[in-house]
């Protein structure tokens, strides 16, 4: 079956955070990381059947849910997950916060690689910890890791956790196995637990390969915690569901207590159903989605090369979040964000949301029907008329 990702569906008036937060209907929102596609039809059908039942009481997590999760990762990624390693939770962000709470005490340090997903910052701060950054190195329109800096920062005995983003948001990198091995070896050497946010793991372009951090070796498995969810890949973030994978029994017990302390383990019946259907029946839909997203990126890349050479974009290996270099404009990212909204009707994320290393960059969500990138024309017209 061929799925139609070109279909335009209005999300206005649905209390969409992405669309209904705009001050004007003339603003095109390409900021928040969700997609403007309907989810897989099999998921819609399963949810419709559940709604027709009409009773939405307290729900348990069935055996079939765990079988769907473990089956998917074994089949698609070659990662064998024991059921007992899985901790159900209501989202990756609550999961990360609970894991930090479980593995640190106030005053400890947590390391990140900026620019990085901004919710990492609040999760660290809300648990009374100090953030330490080992910035990524930007060159030739891509990002790499400064291993010497990472080694130096993790050697601080106050650093207890490293938050890894794999694939990386907003850099668009899908970390190679050898890169993850070097990260893991450094962290194990300094007794730092790697907490890997792998929510974008299904959104990897065919030329690249996602490696689950905990799958690399038994040693890595027991020194890491992985957070996963079908929400990004299948566009079901509103159903609030995720899983923590932790093989180490001692860490898992601490995390389980923190999850319950934070009260983020209540079961959403629709999330449970959607996850099972996504993993059991959604693979072909996902494969077609990935091809469509890559075609969107190639379209955007070519458009920018031809019409907006002053706006180079990073090489996108995975996710649907393009990182645009706007340094040549000499405008602060937050000012540029506001000017694009006011003058071009285009809402992007200021790079500084993701750390000071994001200065001069903008993040652009391209998970939309290909007819939507009239937004590129918005940007071109703005650049031409206003000279930015």
What name fits each language-model region?
Residues 276, 293-301, 313-326, 358:
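Conserved glycine-rich beta-strand-loop-beta hairpin in the small C-terminal domain of fold type I
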Residues 127, 189-190, 220, 344:
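Helix C-cap/helix->beta junction micro-motif
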Residues 56-185, 202-203, 210-215, 219, ...:
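Conserved core of the PLP fold type I
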Residues 45, 218, 222-294, 298-302:
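Conserved core segment of the aminotransferase class I/II
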């Amino acid at each position: 079956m061929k799925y139609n990702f070109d279909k335009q569906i209005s999300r206005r008036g649905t209390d969409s955070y992405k669309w209904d937060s705009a001050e004007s209907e003339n603003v095109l929102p390409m900021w928040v990381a969700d997609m403007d596609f309907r989810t897989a039809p099999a998921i819609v059908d399963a949810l419709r059947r559940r709604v027709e039942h009409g009773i939405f009481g307290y729900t348990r997590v069935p055996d079939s849910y765990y079988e769907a999760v473990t089956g998917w990762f074994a089949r698609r990624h070659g990662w064998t997950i024991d059921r007992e390693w899985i901790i159900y939770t209501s989202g990756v962000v609550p999961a990360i916060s609970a894991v930090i709470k479980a593995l640190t005490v106030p005053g400890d340090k947590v390391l990140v690689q900026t620019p990085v997903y901004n919710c990492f910052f609040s999760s660290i701060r809300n648990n009374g910890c100090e953030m330490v950054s080992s910035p990524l190195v930007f060159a030739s329109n891509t990002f790499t890791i400064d291993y010497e800096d990472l080694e130096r920062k993790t050697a601080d005995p106050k650093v207890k956790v490293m938050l890894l983003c794999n694939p990386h948001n907003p850099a668009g990198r899908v970390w190679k196995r050898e890169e993850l091995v070097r990260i893991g070896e450094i962290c194990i050497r300094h007794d730092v637990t790697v907490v890997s946010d792998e929510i974008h793991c299904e959104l990897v372009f065919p030329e690249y390969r996602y490696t689950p951090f905990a799958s690399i070796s038994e040693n890595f498995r027991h020194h890491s915690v992985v957070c996963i969810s079908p929400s990004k890949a299948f566009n079901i973030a509103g159903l609030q569901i995720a899983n923590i994978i932790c093989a180490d029994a001692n860490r898992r017990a601490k995390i389980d207590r923190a999850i319950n302390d934070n009260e983020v383990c209540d079961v959403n019946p629709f999330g449970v159903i959607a996850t099972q259907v996504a993993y059991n029946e959604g693979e072909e839909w996902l494969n077609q989605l990935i091809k469509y997203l890559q075609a969107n990126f190639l379209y955007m890349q070519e458009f920018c090369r031809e019409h907006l050479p002053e706006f180079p974009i990073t090489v996108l290996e995975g996710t649907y979040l393009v990182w645009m270099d706007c340094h040549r404009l000499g405008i602060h990212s937050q000012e540029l964000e506001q000017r694009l909204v006011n003058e071009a009707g285009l809402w992007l994320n200021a790079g500084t949301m993701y750390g000071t290393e994001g200065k001069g960059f903008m993040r652009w969500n391209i998970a939309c029907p290909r007819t939507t990138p009239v937004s590129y024309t918005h940007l071109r017209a703005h650049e031409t008329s206003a000279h930015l």
